[in-house]
Amino acid sequence: MAVGGFEMRIGNGYDFHRLVEGRRLILGGVEIPYRLGLLGHSDADLLTHAITDALLGAACLGDIGRHFPPGDPQWQDVSSLLLLSKVLELVRGRGLRLSNVDAVVVAERPKLAPHIPAIRQSLAGALGLPLDRLSVKATTNEGLGPVGEGLAMACHAVVLLEE
């Protein structure tokens, strides 16, 4: 869609991970103090994964699993911010510019509101975006399903790219 002479592309990303003992809880590159962490091949930062997938979708470049296969040892325990930076290079290489990000983390526990400012700062730096173009919110699942029972977390992200 062209608006004001710019072609715009919207991407949607989603991620879901189980919470387990013995792992750190990383969201947006920030470690959140909690007794459980997210299970995954990398650091399992589902917020960064959802944003990464949204970027790939908007650029029509596939999905995060295609670029960083979960069975590939080079991505074992890697920071998801590294994956995000590699995807940003691909997106920018196609002549696309990130305009804004809106994301919502769905988690019953821990309460994320106190950590949102640090998460936004971390992601703004990684994405090269001013804070007024990066929204991160948190909500619960009202006690329903695996997320509501505190067994998992989910994240939805939307990005807008401009050509």
From Swiss-Prot:
Site positions for Transition state stabilizer: 41, 140
GO biological process, one term: isopentenyl diphosphate biosynthetic process, methylerythritol 4-phosphate pathway
Cofactor(s) needed for function: a divalent metal cation
InterPro entries, sorted: MECDP_synthase, MECDP_synthase_CS, MECDP_synthase_sf
Catalytic activity: 4-CDP-2-C-methyl-D-erythritol 2-phosphate = 2-C-methyl-D-erythritol 2,4-cyclic diphosphate + CMP
Associated pathway: Isoprenoid biosynthesis; isopentenyl diphosphate biosynthesis via DXP pathway; isopentenyl diphosphate from 1-deoxy-D-xylulose 5-phosphate: step 4/6
Origin superkingdom: Bacteria
Binding positions for 4-CDP-2-C-methyl-D-erythritol 2-phosphate per the UniProt entry: 15-17, 41-42, 63-65, 139-142
Alphabetical keyword list: Isoprene biosynthesis, Lyase, Metal-binding
Alphabetized Pfam families for the sequence: YgbB
Positions that bind a divalent metal cation: 15, 17, 49
Entry's cofactor comment: Binds 1 divalent metal cation per subunit.
EC assignment: 4.6.1.12
GO function terms (MF aspect): 2-C-methyl-D-erythritol 2,4-cyclodiphosphate synthase activity; metal ion binding
PROSITE patterns per record: ISPF (PS01350)
Family to which this protein belongs: Belongs to the IspF family.
Complexes and interactors: Homotrimer.
Described purpose of this protein according to its UniProt entry: Involved in the biosynthesis of isopentenyl diphosphate (IPP) and dimethylallyl diphosphate (DMAPP), two major building blocks of isoprenoid compounds. Catalyzes the conversion of 4-diphosphocytidyl-2-C-methyl-D-erythritol 2-phosphate (CDP-ME2P) to 2-C-methyl-D-erythritol 2,4-cyclodiphosphate (ME-CPP) with a corresponding release of cytidine 5-monophosphate (CMP).
Name assigned to this protein: 2-C-methyl-D-erythritol 2,4-cyclodiphosphate synthase
Lineage: Bacteria, Bacillati, Cyanobacteriota, Cyanophyceae, Gloeobacterales
